[in-house]
């Protein structure tokens, strides 16, 4: 009788596990792990020209989700085919391939991969910049002692893990680079993954289309899948996608189960996956951080400028990167030719600073207005009481994170682009200052405390008599 009960209990447990596995698909969660390894190693090997073994050790292996599986993770870098494969104990394999001009993309099956034409590739990165030069061709060391001390602290490592792994710091004041420093293996022209800082770039691409009157922020998002007569998602606006207040079930948790990670690493058509999400709240009433929301904007940008990878690359370089003199940029695409505008742009630290300078100058570069008048103010207004604006983080409002930054000495008018592992841009209009810190930081919150200290000490160095 006791044995029978145990067998019944075991059967119930196994049945429950089967149901849970069918719903939550742990295989998909684990595949996001091999997808991250394959994709990020591909990008940092073939775009950034970094050592893949060092990238795995510094960037991937220490991440919280990898601590339990890194021992079983295997990867192969094929320099001849320009691809990276990764697997977990020989299964759940992922493969990423490099494409000229478009960076790396995960291959999920036999899908056709979007490419850029030779004419587009030849035209990229060659147009004359409108932004005045921020520096010459050599590294600019700090000359003010307190500024040098600030950079020393930004690169200093704690006695034990987790590590800061600062890779680059660039500081631009009143349009001129006043200090920069790079870790070994990195330099002025090294393209560095910005992760979610790319969302601020997508904000700019949307802003350019608004300036050209090809998009309207308070109009419904032009996604055909939502245009059914009885589809409540048809009420979601461009602004609500920018502000992550769409009400869609696309909340981001950072786990292998959340929709953003499954979108990035298990879907060839990322926006197609995201646009299938259901509504869980009325649009504009609920905020939740969501890379998938930004990816929907990337699809809208692609479709508005021609619907192909070739068209969106020409648009991004002609209208944004070339005027700013951003020569190192790789804006990666998914298989459909949609920019991965939520997560995957690589650029040198100087180019990230040039991008920040566009916003510092209210969307004007070389006398030409690129972004609509008032766009920067719109982008940095807090959303529903949070510290998030519309593609930028802000110090405005009463969010605890914003209030903390002000308390430690960061001006109230500052706003930020934040990316995973400590990628940071700070734009501070009252100081005419742009600060970029690129890292592979595994300290709490991507070493936010270290970045805040860098900002405060940089400002102090500009005002020695205060």
Locate the predicted segments by residue.
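Structured C-terminal helix/loop/strand segments within mature extracytoplasmic catalytic/sensor domains
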Residues: 29, 414-466
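Beta-lactamase-like hydrolase cores
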Residues: 134-174
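Short, charged, amphipathic alpha-helices and their helix-cap/turn boundaries
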Residues: 146-153, 176-181, 220-222, 257-283, ...
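Active-site SXXK
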Residues: 175, 193-221, 241, 297-301, ...
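Active-site-proximal alpha-helical segments within enzyme catalytic domains
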Residues: 200-203, 292-302, 343-364, 423-439
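Active-site helix/loop module of the DD-peptidase/beta-lactamase fold
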Residues: 211-249, 276-279, 306-343
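Conserved catalytic neighborhood of penicillin-recognizing serine enzymes
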Residues: 227-257, 263-285, 292-295, 347-350
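Active-site Gly/Thr loop motif
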Residues: 326-330, 380-434
């Amino acid at each position: 009788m006791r044995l029978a009960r145990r067998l019944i209990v075991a059967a119930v447990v196994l049945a429950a596990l089967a149901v849970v596995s069918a719903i939550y698909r742990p295989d998909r969660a684990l595949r996001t792990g091999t997808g991250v390894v394959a994709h990020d190693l591909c990008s940092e090997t073939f775009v950034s020209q970094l050592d893949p073994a060092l990238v795995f050790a510094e960037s991937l292996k220490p991440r919280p989700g990898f601590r339990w599986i890194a021992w079983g993770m295997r990867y192969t870098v094929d320099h001849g085919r320009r691809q990276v494969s990764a697997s977990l104990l020989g299964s759940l394999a992922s493969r990423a391939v490099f494409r000229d001009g478009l960076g790396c993309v995960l291959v999920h099956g036999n899908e056709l991969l979007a490419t850029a034409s030779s004419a587009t590739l030849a035209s990229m990165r060659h147009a004359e910049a409108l932004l005045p030069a921020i520096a010459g061709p050599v590294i600019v060391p700090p000359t003010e002692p307190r500024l040098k001390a600030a950079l020393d602290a930004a690169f200093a490592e704690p006695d034990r893990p987790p590590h800061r792994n600062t890779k680059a710091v660039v500081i631009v004041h009143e349009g001129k680079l006043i200090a920069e420093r790079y870790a070994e293996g990195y330099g002025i022209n090294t393209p560095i993954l910005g992760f979610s800082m790319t969302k601020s770039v997508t904000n700019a691409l949307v802003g350019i289309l608004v300036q050209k009157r090809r998009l309207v922020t308070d109009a419904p998002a032009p996604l055909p899948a939502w245009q059914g007569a009885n589809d409540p998602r048809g009420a979601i606006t461009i602004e609500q996608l920018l502000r992550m207040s769409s009400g869609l079930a696309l909340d981001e948790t950072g786990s292998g189960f959340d929709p953003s990670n499954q979108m990035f690493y298990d879907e060839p058509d990322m926006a197609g996956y995201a646009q299938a999400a259901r509504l869980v709240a009325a649009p504009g009433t609920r905020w939740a951080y969501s890379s998938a929301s930004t990816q929907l904007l990337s699809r809208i940008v692609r479709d508005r400028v021609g619907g192909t990878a070739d068209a969106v690359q020409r648009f991004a370089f002609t209208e944004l990167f070339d005027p700013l003199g951003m020569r190192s940029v790789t804006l990666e695409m998914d298989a459909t030719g949609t920019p991965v505008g939520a997560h995957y742009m690589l650029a040198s630290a100087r180019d990230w600073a040039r991008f920040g300078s566009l916003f510092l100058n209210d969307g004007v570069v070389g006398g030409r207005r690129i972004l609509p008048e008032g766009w920067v103010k719109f982008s940095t207004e807090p959303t529903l009481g949070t510290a998030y604006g519309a593609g930028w983080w802000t110090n405005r409002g009463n969010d605890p994170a914003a209030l903390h930054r002000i308390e430690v000495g960061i001006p109230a008018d500052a706003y930020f682009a934040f990316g995973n592992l400590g990628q940071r841009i700070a734009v501070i209009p009252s100081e005419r200052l742009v600060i970029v810190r690129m890292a592979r930081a595994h300290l709490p919150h991507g070493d936010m405390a270290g970045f805040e200290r860098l900002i405060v000490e940089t400002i102090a160095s500009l005002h020695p008599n205060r």
